[in-house]
Amino acid sequence: DWCVIRLGVAGIVSGFEIDTSHFTGNFPPGAEIEVCRSDEINPETGWLKVTPRLDLKGDDRVFVPVEHPTPITHVRLHIYPDGGVARLRVWGRVDPDWTKVGADETIDLLAMARGGRGIIANDEHYGAVGNLTAPGRGVNMGDGWETRRRREPGHDWAVLALGTFGKVDEVIVDTAHFKGNYPDRCSIQGSARAHGTPEEIAAQAETWPVLLPEVKLKPDHVHHFAGDLLDIGPIRFVRLNIYPDGGVSRLRLMGKVVR
């Protein structure tokens, strides 16, 4: 038996995880995976095998690393001869087709679906920095980025990468669900270049030019900042500073791709 799954976005795969949780007497003894990149799946679609025949066990998880540098859009999972699979995870990084984005089209340059990602934060006690780029509004506080309460001088920060180079025209800061624990203020710095480890990038970010000067925030609110932005040219990275600490649900950087 087999099934075809379309990925949420095109991406470069680094590994697959086949999970047979709860399938103890009806799991498939074997499996293999094929991939392709295509707008439409039809009988003429060319599939590429990227894993060997895998041996599976019941109520188990198997991770298979792969090296496939070409972006893919679909996965075909074969199970031998039949049975049940609880989850298939496809690990990798988003790699959008930027030719499909118009020169004058305004998009969220930091969106997860566009390749935006969190790099590092000084604190992720209650929520991961990567949540800032997720689609939609946060479903609860745990679906955002929140730091512990700061008992020492200073402020908290997070560094993120845009999907590609872009000119930011509007910043949207959403503090959904954060009512007594939202940051009092925030600011944003930006840069076209960054290199090295996450820790090295964090050190570089301290001196990046200011994109959004320090502004006040409200609880459980979608803030739009456009006229407050400074012109620092196209950027690829940002540092979000929150004063002194707290939680932010989503960060949107609306603008145009710079090719």
Predicted regions and their residues:
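Edge beta-strands of jelly-roll/beta-sandwich modules across compartments, strongly enriched
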Residues: 83-100, 246-259
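Short, surface-exposed beta-strand/strand-loop-strand elements in extracellular ectodomains
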Residues: 24-38, 181-194
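Acidic Ser/Thr/Pro-rich low-complexity disordered segments
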Residues: 39-48, 104-107, 194-209
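Predominantly extracellular/luminal cell-surface or secreted proteins
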Residues: 19, 34-38, 91, 174, ...
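A short beta-strand element within beta-rich, extracytoplasmic domains
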Residues: 11-25, 77, 166-178, 240
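Beta-sandwich interaction modules
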Residues: 10, 48-84, 155-157, 162, ...
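Disordered, acidic Ser/Thr/Pro-rich linker "stalks" and the adjacent N-terminal cap
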Residues: 1-6, 24, 93-163, 179-181, ...
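Exposed beta-strand and adjacent loop surfaces of beta-rich binding modules
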Residues: 13-15, 28-30, 85, 168, ...
